[in-house]
Swiss-Prot record:
GO CC annotation, single: nucleoplasm
Transcription recorded as keyword: yes
Species lineage: Eukaryota, Metazoa, Ecdysozoa, Arthropoda, Hexapoda
Name of the gene: JMJD6
Listed InterPro entries: JmjC_dom, JMJD6_ArgDemeth/LysHydrox
Cofactor note: Binds 1 Fe(2+) ion per subunit.
Protein name: Bifunctional arginine demethylase and lysyl-hydroxylase JMJD6
UniProt-listed PANTHER family: ARGININE DEMETHYLASE AND LYSYL-HYDROXYLASE JMJD (PTHR12480), BIFUNCTIONAL ARGININE DEMETHYLASE AND LYSYL-HYDROXYLASE JMJD6 (PTHR12480:SF32)
Major localization listed first in the record, in broad terms: nucleus
Amino acids binding substrate: T189, K209
Biased composition (Gly residues): 393-408
Residues where 2-oxoglutarate binds: N202, T290
Low complexity composition bias: residue spans: 345-361
Length: 408
């Protein structure tokens, strides 16, 4: 019997509606669980974590910049959550009670608009689902809602990541940058690079996340799942770990593109430098907060990509920087936009998994729309980008526009 039939009637009805809108291509009775990953998920735990850990209390900001941020080196940070109210408040039971009738984004429809679900229904779905790649909350608008914004009181930005240069664009114009993310085992984020050269941090409050990270020079064709391999689930994290990951463990896989692997536990924060490919699979029920950022350290790359990908936004940004941060405006003026940044982009103009390497052409490398996101660290999915591109080509506008504010 499908897990949907185990849900209360109203939850079952709402879950079906959300699924129909978010993934209309999965239209068969058993399409959501055709691969039966729920029954064969145990082997996905079998890997070796190989990423360095540091303690926030033992590494000052200046040392973090020199050891990790400036050389674009991933790391796991412990101790960032000390004193966070989220440790106590962010449980399934408490979230289902406090935010029971609040709607959170868990997908997008074919027009690129948000598909939302009430928290009470989503928690019931989480606790019963046997879907191969379940619905996943990835809400960037929670901070704009008078009730959901209370989540902001439950955490603080870790000390290494408080340099927030996109704030000078204005809260209504800046690209989406923070997400409340929550999902069951087998949900997750397909392989991607975060937008506009931004770096990201992801702090896990509950559960475990499995990460694979690859340096920016890794050719896209090595990492992307083809239609032949993944079918209708080609963009899903569990599909990537089933099809591409085994190849990364073969002797024939290029040594310079070996993955960094992480099992992130509750209380740990993963730092993802700009330009790094990464894929994330939830191993059990997870709740996390993640933010993308531009700092003084990564500003040259972020500025370069923003000018190329979001020219109107860059002009507004530069006007404010000239007034409030003239030293950064001077850096912006000195950057040669005709030179490559050396960092790849998960380009919306070339989303085919069989396409050429992301570093093979300057035009592809620098194409990045920086739109709304639905992942663990801020990059928009290829599926969402294609939907949005179709809508814009047809003259659509409104809440799905790419003006930097999130859809709600």
């Amino acid at each position: 019997m499908s897990e949907e039939f185990k849900l209360p009637k109203r939850s079952r009805k709402r879950t079906r509606e959300v699924k129909r809108k978010a993934r209309p291509e999965l239209d068969g009775e058993n399409a959501w669980s055709a691969m039966r990953y729920c029954e064969k998920f145990e082997p996905f735990w079998d890997f070796t974590d190989n990423l360095e850990r540091i303690e926030e209390s033992q590494v000052p900001e200046s040392e973090f910049i020199e050891r990790f941020e400036r050389p674009y080196k991933p790391v796991v940070i412990r101790g960032c959550t000390d004193g966070w109210l989220a440790l106590e408040k962010w449980t399934l039971a408490r979230l289902a009670k406090k935010y029971r009738n609040q709607k959170f984004k868990c997908g997008e429809d074919n027009e690129g608009y948000s598909v939302k679900m009430k928290m009470k229904y989503y928690v019931e779905y989480m606790q019963s689902t046997r879907d191969d790649s379940p619905l996943y909350i990835f809400d960037s608008s929670f901070g704009e809602h008078h009730r959901r914004r209370k989540l902001l009181d439950d955490y603080v930005v870790p000390k290494y990541f408080r340099d927030d240069l996109f704030q000078y664009c204005g809260e209504n114009r800046r690209p989406p940058y923070r997400w409340f993310v929550m999902g069951p085992a087998r949900s997750g984020t397909g392989i991607h690079i975060d937008p506009l050269g931004t770096s990201a941090w992801n702090t896990l409050i509950r559960g475990h996340k499995r990460w694979c990270l690859f340096p920016t020079q890794t050719p896209k064709e090595l990492l992307k799942v083809t239609s032949a391999m993944g079918g209708k689930q080609r963009d899903e994290a569990i599909t990537w770990f089933s099809t591409i990951y085994p190849r990364t463990q073969l002797p024939s896989w290029p040594e310079q593109y070996r993955p960094i692997e992480v099992l992130q536990g509750a209380g740990e924060t993963v730092f993802v430098p700009g330009g790094w490919w990464h894929v994330v699979l939830n191993m059990d029920d997870t709740i996390a907060i993640t933010q993308n950022f531009s700092s003084q350290t990564n500003f040259p790359c972020v500025w370069h990509k923003t000018v190329r990908g979001r020219p109107k936004l860059s002009r507004k940004w530069l006007r404010v920087l000239r007034d409030q941060r003239p030293e950064l405006a001077q850096i912006a003026d000195s950057i040669n936009l005709n030179e490559s940044t050396g960092f790849a982009s998960d380009s919306s103009s070339n989303s085919s998994s069989s396409s050429s390497s992301s570093s093979s052409s300057s035009e592809e490398e620098e194409s990045d729309d920086g739109g709304d996101s639905n992942t663990d660290s801020g990059q928009e999915s290829l599926t969402a980008k294609k939907k949005k591109k179709r809508r814009m080509a047809g003259g659509g506008s409104g809440s799905g526009s790419m003006g930097g504010s999130s859809r709600s």
